[in-house]
Amino acid sequence: TLKSYNPDTKVNIHEEPISSLNAMEIIKDYDIIVNGADNFPTRYLVNDASYMSGKPLVDGSILLFDGQATTFLAGEGCYRCLFPTPPPPGEVPSCAEAGVLGMLPGMVGTIQATEVVKLILGIGETLSGRLLLIDALSMEYRTVKLRRDPKCPLCGDNPTVTELIDYEAFCGGASLIG
């Protein structure tokens, strides 16, 4: 366990799945939020809760042979700026349906951990404002610029999402549990 490596480590166990009812309570004690969820409802929920709490969000995702990672900081955009609406149900297969190259979660997770260390220590340049794309088949990494969308329903100039919503309904019935 983590405590065997460092007895001063504090491990908080949350036995219930994250939801609109408990997300703000769960994340309130954390300085940085890291999301690697494999479903759209949870990704939108964690994004919205992080933004509403003013917490940095280090986000990563994988599917098949592709991965991506970014960091969302206050005032610099959010997941909804990148993906204003979820894809229609069934358009994007789940990781369980499509599969994932076994090494890819470790690659993206290591990038996310590096982002967290940079945020904690205040060093280096985070991925804020950039989306890192990984193509494991060609082993090419590239970045694309991300910008805050003034029309974003969450962080835009005239937000319409001002509280946590029913994310399963928003995502067309997809479950919060991947």
Label each region the model flagged.
Residues 1-178:
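Adenine nucleotide-associated cytosolic modules
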